[in-house]
């Protein structure tokens, strides 16, 4: 395996971040259930370039974590290039001299904040912002779905936003396959504790046919949250969440429940009698009527009646953004063959192989044998559409920089050293591979 002859070690989140020597860790962004994310500066660029570094410390901890890591790596590589999907620049895997894993690293495009921070902020949002965000989500979904992939974990925290209102979807670790032949679908990934507020009813009811409609439901929940500045469905658990949905949408038709619910769930729902539901107009007073019409089509209880991504893109609410040139499909479908691997040793080898296969693609010179790997060439890795606003993109009011990070962290424009503010220490670290 190739080795890097020189790296630097930074301390953050109580962990060693062992990085390519051309990166300087500058701040802590967040801690997820699967990874730790920091901001960094790439020192070899002519201009100051910021990159997000995501460390997965427990990538080989168990089969679920290993598959999630592999799924993330492969999908970010496959979907790389869409303007509304976060860009993966490079990958790395670092072991200590004793052979213990330090972590798998993903060097990603650094965005200023996530959509949940914007929603929770006091900043005034206009209807044009909502339209822009939903349109960009749908453009990305059309691309993702055309690759026979379901995201399965769309929520505001997984939607990254810049001050120019550009939005990008991230976190594909819980994605699953989709086919018109439902027998070959992998179904919703079980075994993870994730937010249920954006889960479609068919997932709550353990329906076996996971379709593109699950992501449309999540997008509807996000639209409702933008309009109301708070989540529409806030269940404490699966049962409570289902109750929240029923109280707003009302009791679904009997034939719908017979198709997607077990007999036990069917009996549970009908013990309440006929729940009338509430109008979206009463829940979201003052909202654009066209937004509410689209919302109703997205939050349809029956997944077969839910609006498709193609029809949603053509909805009148999004007409000011509708541009067929931005609504393109992925040219190649994604294959989830690795999902059927059960051996931890084989899964671990697949992760290592994926890391180094990707590095060969994005680094300036191929990595081979035991020769030192080449330095990153970030300028070569970044396409024009990542660093420039699309010429047809409409201009919206910018967001203030205070939303770049969570409240206790400085923004990217601060002149104060991040490591002094956040207790990040750095030292030279030689010979770690």
Swiss-Prot record:
Induction: Accumulates in large amounts when cell wall integrity is compromised. ATP binds at residues 29-37, 55. Gene3D superfamilies: Phosphorylase Kinase, domain 1, Transferase(Phosphotransferase) domain 1. Residues 23-318 form the Protein kinase domain. GO terms for cellular component: cyclin-dependent protein kinase holoenzyme complex; cytoplasm; nucleus. Transmembrane segments: none annotated. One of its GO terms (molecular function) is ATP binding. Keywords: ATP-binding, Kinase, Nucleotide-binding, Serine/threonine-protein kinase, Transferase. Its EC number is 2.7.11.1. The active site is at 153 (proton acceptor). It catalyses: L-seryl-[protein] + ATP = O-phospho-L-seryl-[protein] + ADP + H(+); L-threonyl-[protein] + ATP = O-phospho-L-threonyl-[protein] + ADP + H(+). One of its GO terms (biological process) is regulation of G2/M transition of mitotic cell cycle. It comes from the Eukaryota. It holds the Pfam family Pkinase. It is an enzyme of class 2 (transferase). PANTHER family: MITOGEN-ACTIVATED PROTEIN KINASE (PTHR24055). Interacts with RLM1. Belongs to the protein kinase superfamily. Ser/Thr protein kinase family. Serine/threonine-protein kinase involved in the SLT2 mitogen-activated (MAP) kinase signaling pathway that regulates cell wall integrity. May also be involved in the mating pheromone and the CWI MAPK pathways. This is Serine/threonine-protein kinase KDX1. It comes from Saccharomyces cerevisiae (strain ATCC 204508 / S288c) (Baker's yeast).
